[in-house]
């Protein structure tokens, strides 16, 4: 017998696919209908050794359908999502439900753009506002409301937003919080073309964002009294700010091959659960400088964030739920399997760090460069928590709650190293064009306690090799080998993956991640994976079978936990 959950999942997926076919065959007058469909499902098999727990419904899946109608300057769209029986990692973060949770209507001309419904938006680098979607992470914090964009003169851009932030599949009705804001940017190269013609870049911008959340309860906390012991402290509801504003100013300047970006943001007092309900204002600074010329490039970045976690609701602390802003991660992002679980997660309440990357190409037709040159990339990044000195009232009470919390020297690094990465990558294409080899080395230091809640530090050496061979113009073979040596956490691992592709339609791969150095002999496990994919026009169908170890998934410094799993997966994506 097929379970009710499987029947519903199959029915929903079939209806969504049918909708794709139906809409893909029609055009209404001068308008055009387009969209895309995605399904990601899995049949789960329990495995006690890797920690893959039995689940009530073994067949699970995530499905969505986007429909967009456009006609001249007008467009309207909606997205239906079916996550009633989602993949277990989505269920664990509360991303479960179904319905049309994204819909909008938009009109745009050269002067104005107006949107009603759901929309995504970002001001500057996102220090004050970033409403975005990342389906892989289960993040969708779109705003439901209205947005206006104005371009009164070329190079002058003004935006204003008002809306309620999406909270997974929870209803909007009854919410007592909303977000509003405005942003202005002036691009002097567009306003005065002579600036751009001379090779200069000059842009400045500023914004303000404010959240409102009704304060309806007192906040209780413990105070340590020398004579009375532990007593209860109270923050009256009328002392809890209902309106919390942030503002930011940014600038970009450049000349030919040099560019400098800077943005500073400040948040008013925002007592909430993630900062232990302190009244200290927050602030963040982002700096980036780049220089590039033929065969050489250098990029340096700096970030400092102090008490800058900014959410629609003060009691929310789950993953990235109801986050209004996003502090960008400036460290280099990697796709290596073995250090994926040690990716750095940006810390909006306490981080200071820097990143340096140098790219150099050994000249073509030289002894070391060969016919096509050899690319070398060096990378170094280091992040600490910030310096914190408790204010006298916090010391006296034995808690920062209800006080200004702490003071902090702006450019002083805190005592705790969060993350450090030293990396070197060499890429070379051989003279016959058929062979390409990438060799990489990284030394990672990762604070398990602060970043993942596990005890200790992880210090590890990673060596990775990626060798590609073009068998024929359409057939290619790729071998990826990795070795992570560490005495910390789960110990050393090796990874091997062989991929064969027949362009442009077929892809096959087999891989194995062996945690041979695990201190527990039972968990010296092989995490194997076999997959194949077929691509036809805009449609991709993929099958995979294997094991996934428990860890984290990170995209751009935003992370979520990934539970261990074992089973057969199916993925379908298409657009029309």
What annotation goes with each model-predicted range?
Residues 68-70, 74-165, 194-196, 294-315:
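Outer membrane beta-barrel
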Residues 55-70, 77:
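Long, low-hydrophobicity, solvent-exposed regions enriched in small/turn-prone and acidic residues
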Residues 60-64, 98-103, 141-145, 180, ...:
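Short alpha-helical segments and helix-capping/turn motifs at coil-helix boundaries
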Residues 139-238, 242-247, 252:
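Hydrophobic, small-residue-rich alpha-helical packing segments that form membrane-like cores
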Residues 26-53, 383:
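Short glycine/proline- and aromatic-enriched beta-strand/turn motifs that initiate or cap beta-hairpins
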Residues 38, 53-56, 194-199, 206-208, ...:
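Exposed, low-structure sequence patches enriched in small/polar residues
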Residues 25-33, 69-76, 106-111, 115, ...:
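Short loop/turn motifs that connect adjacent beta-strands in outer-membrane beta-barrel proteins
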Residues 1-34, 575-576:
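Bacterial Sec-dependent N-terminal signal peptides
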